[in-house]
């Protein structure tokens, strides 16, 4: 049985609605054949935007959010101590935002991961679905609607995550490439060694948000996108990777190694791998999963144990256990690199 089924029975049911009155929800108990009966246009989405000194491009980002075809959207902005005009720009949008409410809160000022974590666990943020958002991208108009349409086919109690490819654009907005097109299925075995998509493409339903919030209450994480992918697949949730680029990721001086399309970015990641940075990230991910073992399915727990053991002992033992665990990256080259990194004890 997927562990999310046990979790939803314990999930806190009281919810705070900040702007609109709560919509009456069906009292019918969910079962595997019970579809989400709330019409897609009635699904309220909370956009969780983390900001810090983003005045240069945040206006274009906000323009693309307002242009979304989905009608019900609340914008939550957690500012991590901006010293430029970011806060003033966001506040100027309050009167223009005609999709719902705009709320601004103070971030924890401990980095972007902690900033997103603060919003994930914030019980004041109440919605049917939640979308992570950066401060300098451009969303395609149907980015939210596409995700909601996919989710409509599932029981509302199943943790769901939608993500997609990204197009990469220059500082001036010209598209210069796309992130790699992945073809392997999303799974926990993939999530253990790879984050499949950027957080700026992720939308999760309420069941997934509650699950990730529970898991995040007792641990910090490396990045919100990777952690969300790990937790949802560990608990038996469903992940959809859309091959279409639904977000244009802006490449600029402050994030030159953030995209997947430039050789500079790839070389930088390779350098971090062999410096042991990836091993440190894996340590943190495994530590977070260990304290949340109760959410793991039996299969995920078995895979986690094998993968954890594969990082210890002699070379042949490590490679044997790694293969037995079944973990994989999305490309053949990536999986070969994974095994090479294991040989050099860099994961």
What role is predicted for each listed range?
Residues 6, 19-20, 30-31:
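Acidic, Ala/Val/Gly-enriched low-complexity intrinsically disordered segments
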Residues 8, 17-19, 58, 117, ...:
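Compositionally biased, low-structure terminal segments
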Residues 8, 22, 39-41, 52, ...:
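Generic low-complexity, intrinsically disordered sequence content enriched
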Residues 10-15, 23-29:
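Basic polycationic patches enriched in arginine
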Residues 31-261:
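Nucleotide-sugar donor-binding/catalytic module of glycosyltransferases
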Residues 217, 221, 227, 248-347:
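C-terminal subregions of glycosyltransferases and related glycan-biosynthesis enzymes
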